[in-house]
Amino acid sequence: MNTRNNLQVEGFFDPATWTVSYIVFDRKTQVCALIDSVLDYDPKSGRTSHGSADRLIERVRELGAKVQWILETHVHADHLSAAPYLKQALGGKLGIGQHITTVQKAFGSLFNAGSNFADDGRQFDQLFADGEAFEIGSLKAIAIHTPGHTPGHTPACMTYVVSDDKAAAADSAAFVGDTLFMPDYGTARCDFPGGDARTLYRSINKVLSLSPATRLYMCHDYQPGGRDVQFVSTVAEEREKNVHARNGISEEEFVAMRNARDVTLGMPTLILPSVQVNMRAGQLPEPEANGTRYIKIPLNAV
């Protein structure tokens, strides 16, 4: 837990998907945002459960907090979002980047989602534009478009920068989604449909142009070498030490490295169920005539 001035950040690590979910809490107003939640999913049985989300709910209630926002940094391809479950339990507005609509169009077509699937973003309460300001209680926040990694031809990837209005830059926090990882692991892959290494490099530079003391909160930690979980870095640390994107690595070098590395990677285990659910803001597909919901597996299409 990081607590500075009115801004308090708590991370919750899910070892099954290597995902970190966050509570961003304004101690002054007792208001919070939840970022990148996880719906537990067993791909062998097709069963969902709520252990990870219930940890967030329990902690929010311990804090006595009111949920103002449930935020997604992007349409995740490696875990399912628990946003609807959290919203039902705690309230709050669901937000993502405005380019979710292009993601929905692309993947609605891939999964043949049908006419009942809305591809205009209406499943979300707020579609953030690049540079759009908003508040979490008395905390100031800004949404920055940081595409390059996620599926979709104009990805909905966002970085959310949050600060106490009266605090120094060292008290700012940026939730970077899958742009950067901890310095010893590097950066996100770019080989999903619509991903692009050159675009990601430029997005990373947006993040690394923030104040050097800005704390960066990762969406994942893959524990290279079996080390303990780590998910907080700073702009300065990433500039100095990131194995893929430190100072001195050119755009051309990054693109060549990223493209060469990505061709060696298999698809994430949960990419097909994740994208189908997350393009719907975490809602499961509608039940069919027999009352059962289904995840589709498009053959030879991804």
Language-model regions, residue ranges each:
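Short aromatic-enriched loop/helix-cap "lid" or pocket-rim segments at secondary-structure transitions
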Residues: R47, A106-S109, T187-A188, R227-V232
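Generic structural signal for helix capping and beta-alpha/helix-loop junctions
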Residues: A77, V103-Q104, G226
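Accessory terminal helices/loops
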Residues: M1-Q8, H99, G195, R202-R215, ...
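Short, hinge-like loop/turn segments at secondary-structure boundaries
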Residues: Q88, L110-F117, G194, T234-V235
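Active-site metal-binding motif and surrounding structural segment of the metallo-beta-lactamase
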Residues: G46-G95
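Acidic/polar short surface loop at catalytic or gating sites that assists cofactor/ion binding
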Residues: L94-F124, R261
